[in-house]
Amino acid sequence: MLSVVENGLDPQAAIPVIKKKLVGSVKALQKQYVSLDTVVTSEDGDANTMCSALEAVFIHGLHAKHIRAEAGGKRKKSAHQKPLPQPVFWPLLKAVTHKHIISELEHLTFVNTDVGRCRAWLRLALNDGLMECYLKLLLQEQARLHEYYQPTALLRDAEEGEFLLSFLQGLTSLSFELSYKSAILNEWTLTPLALSGLCPLSELDPLSTSGAELQRKESLDSISHSSGSEDIEVHHSGHKIRRNQKLTASSLSLDTASSSQLSCSLNSDSCLLQENGSKSPDHCEEPMSCDSDLGTANAEDSDRSLQEVLLEFSKAQVNSVPTNGLSQETEIPTPQASLSLHGLNTSTYLHCEAPAEPLPAQAASGTQDGVHVQEPRPQAPSPLDLQQPVESTSGQQPSSTVSETAREVGQGNGLQKAQAHDGAGLKLVVSSPTSPKNKSWISEDDFYRPSREQPLESASDHPIASYRGTPGSRPGLHRHFSQEPRKNCSLGALDQACVPSPGRRQAQAAPSQGHKSFRVVHRRQMGLSNPFRGLMKLGTVERRGAMGIWKELFCELSPLEFRLYLSNEEHTCVENCSLLRCESVGPAHSDGRFELVFSGKKLALRASSQDEAEDWLDRVREALQKVRPQQEDEWVNVQYPDQPEEPPEAPQGCLSPSDLLSEPAALQGTQFDWSSAQVPEPDAIKESLLYLYMDRTWMPYIFSLSLEALKCFRIRNNEKMLSDSHGVETIRDILPDTSLGGPSFFKIITAKAVLKLQAGNAEEAALWRDLVRKVLASYLETAEEAVTLGGSLDENCQEVLKFATRENGFLLQYLVAIPMEKGLDSQGCFCAGCSRQIGFSFVRPKLCAFSGLYYCDICHQDDASVIPARIIHNWDLTKRPICRQALKFLTQIRAQPLINLQMVNASLYEHVERMHLIGRRREQLKLLGDYLGLCRSGALKELSKRLNHRNYLLESPHRFSVADLQQIADGVYEGFLKALIEFASQHVYHCDLCTQRGFICQICQHHDIIFPFEFDTTVRCAECKTVFHQSCQAVVKKGCPRCARRRKYQEQNIFA
């Protein structure tokens, strides 16, 4: 077993080192990505540093029995090297991880060790945003921590654990897409072991060792294998290459002074990086060329191997640049620069450093290869990172950089071999992917070159000769492409996409200042903040009514809707127009008037001034451009004036330049695999494979439509995994979107996002649109049926209910029906509010008593409320915890009489004495309301104030609101009704007009005036509504005298 103190740092001394690395890397990531919409990938050096620091957190303080020596015989070690320790804590991680995640990690193709699963688990947890949750669960498992860690371990320290939890909260603002399927993860690298104290920290710095020997292999932490592409970047740390070592793309990554970097395109299925002595996954006999175990090398060996490297590159055209005592650099494109996969935002260059005084042999060698050298002219620095450009003859091609459009050409996975000139030192440099994007509104991509008709200076007037994008002018590069067996891109596509060389750009920049040959295209660039978050504009406008009268209203403009309210204080919506139905936007007049025309409706509005009206119109147009189907912004294609009219033909299987300028959606549907052998969901009305457009690419998902939700599944290990779920109530509209490429494209607009989808053919897309519309219609009919339980509603109630139904309409069904708890599996372990993962080893789920659904701790904060359905059916007055969504819904409809108790459960009056008394008082109040409504004294207005504007109490005795049920549960409703009855009855007794509307008992003929609301002393005929004394009616027992007279008169009329 290995001792931590003997081989590395003291356990207590390692903790601040780990914290320093973690804090620095997270702060760097936040500073770079927090204001961008891009994701953090494994190509970022700070992300790799953060992963190493987190790995050190889990390694620090492990018991010796969980640390074993390096796996036997996988790498060949020299006599000076010691085996790296291999700590394993995979069983600990399995205790807090969901079974689906464990199954996925254990079935990865190239990750086949427990060490690899530990490292893959950490990166997958960062991708899913669950690192904080996992760590919280681990800190609660004290028994397991005691089993795996020493008392001095970082995870055993309560204060350090709290620090980690609070610090990892900063990762919630970042989105990760780290690689976790690479075979590189199968063994530990040096960095986490050194940070945790298992290895000396001095081994992290290769310059700290002697210049003749390297005691330890370099760390592979900077090796980045993006899981979403097939690009692998190898960053070597200044190590020498043995003179007998085979020269490959990876061994050509040299820099005698500092580290150099190489971006190579590898097939992730067959050419994954391995350690020295290991075999590739396809069991090839020859060790992989990316081995970093270099053994012992001296300076002379390095120089000789460098010459061999330069000889290997001798077939390519390179500009040899002699200078007068100054080291100058120029750049030429490498094949990797033009064949980088889509999504890699780096450009690769070969920097040729010329010596201060070139040797004659070198000059001769350059001449033999066809490279002519001339004295350079002093020039100003170019904006494209060219330190000092050089001059070339007409026979020599200048260097050029590759535009971002050309970087997206390559989709192949062949390993491209670079070639370079023999006479100068080479430095292969990949621009850092972590460099921040230009946030300016105008970039170099926004500039057009002068038109072809514009006369240009001759080649002799420029320090750099004109460029010809033909294969013949670049024989070396063309020969390289013709010999490459895995070519995937045409040279013509590369040449068309190339940006002018730095020298030529500088040469043309000077005259452009005087003649203004450039023109700037103003367009918003990628990576800037999204302006469509929340409300786009709000304020006060006036609307012209039917009679030409202007009424002041409060207006809100959102990315999808244009809403008008009565006032800012009283947030009652009077008009709600969907921008999807907007037909035209009128101009702004001098007095501030403007018009908005929707389908079947025209809004005549007036702002305070013309400028304010124009601002409203600009915001509306901006929202319309966002919400409507629009063609993508055209890319700027920078071409040379003297470029041939017809570029060379592209080989088969290659994207043409027109494909580069088009939306990825325009690709042919034959490239997609539409087969799916998954079993449909039990409640699915329609389920099929659709392609979803996200992150500028089409991804396959299985969509399942039911009467309740539209679910989105992704396929992992031939199993369906729920990715997202959209309730039917959140679907706003479904529209065809032929602008994406054809009739098979459509989009679904939901409350959370706009889903751009592609079906297999136009008929399939039409079927999806028809079924989604039918499900929406069924849902709306169900909502209307639920509303009818409350009887007829006034206009205000309808508007409020419409607003509440639009946001949380699915909750309306639970207003009068007790919910059935379906279980967490029916939700796919996702929160019903925010789609966050909940359940075992995730956030603890919380049950909402109102809807019977499960929510996370953010959407459910244990707000207590009575459940209306339980009061109606079970007379359960207990307050139960409900989610924030249900609380908001109950607050919105609190004062609306949506529950008709006579229709829902009339037996409640019979079985509950309190409800029987409440029912009688509600009937009394209704009868008193009839009297006060006919009185001209204004008593009805006073009664309305006492009712708190609940006028429905005077209209129907059986309509109840949520506020009524809450007061019944609190025991104050009976007193509230009693006070109203006393006030109204006192008015009737003392009002001359109301007294004249009383009754005289027709049985006893007494002169006392009686009223129908006196339930204790009077009785009323159900047929003619005549009122009698109860005692008189009980003595006579002959029924109603008035009804008897009416029947007698009718019989006489019949006989007559």
From Swiss-Prot:
Where is the segment annotated Interaction with RAB7A? Answer: 654-1056
Q: Which residues carry this modification: Phosphoserine?
A: S219, S432, S435, S490
A Pfam family hit: RUN
Q: Does the keyword Coiled coil apply?
A: no
Q: What is the effect of changing R714C?
A: In OPTA3; uncertain significance
Q: Give the matching InterPro entries.
A: DEF8 (IPR051366), PE/DAG-bd (IPR002219), PH-like_dom_sf (IPR011993), PH_domain (IPR001849), PLEKHM1_PH (IPR042827), RH_dom (IPR025258), Run_dom (IPR004012), Run_dom_sf (IPR037213)
**What PROSITE patterns does its record include?**
PH_DOMAIN (PS50003), RUN (PS50826), ZF_DAG_PE_2 (PS50081)
An example GO CC term for this entry is: late endosome membrane
Compositional bias per record (Polar residues), positions renumbered to this chain: 389-404
Q: Which residues form the RUN domain?
A: 41-183
Task: Please state where this protein is localized.
Answer: Autolysosome membrane; Endosome membrane; Late endosome membrane; Lysosome membrane
* SMART domains according to UniProt: C1 (SM00109), DUF4206 (SM01175), PH (SM00233), RUN (SM00593)
Q: What does this protein do?
A: Acts as a multivalent adapter protein that regulates Rab7-dependent and HOPS complex-dependent fusion events in the endolysosomal system and couples autophagic and the endocytic trafficking pathways. Acts as a dual effector of RAB7A and ARL8B that simultaneously binds these GTPases, bringing about clustering and fusion of late endosomes and lysosomes. Required for late stages of endolysosomal maturation, facilitating both endocytosis-mediated degradation of growth factor receptors and autophagosome clearance. (Microbial infection) In case of infection contributes to Salmonella typhimurium pathogenesis by supporting the integrity of the Salmonella-containing vacuole (SCV) probably in concert with the HOPS complex and Rab7.
Subunit architecture: Interacts (via N- and C-terminus) with RAB7A (GTP-bound form). Simultaneously interacts with RAB7A and ARL8B; bringing about clustering and fusion of late endosomes and lysosomes. Interacts (via RUN domain) with ARL8B (GTP-bound form); the interaction is required for PLEKHM1 localization to lysosomes and for ARL8B function in delivery and degradation of endocytic and autophagic cargo in lysosomes. PLEKHM1 and PLEKHM2 compete for interaction with ARL8B. Interacts with ARL8A; the interaction is weaker than with ARL8B.
- Mention any additional remark: Sialyl-lex is a carcinoma associated antigen.
Q: This chain belongs to which protein, by name?
A: Pleckstrin homology domain-containing family M member 1
Q: Which organism is it from?
A: Homo sapiens
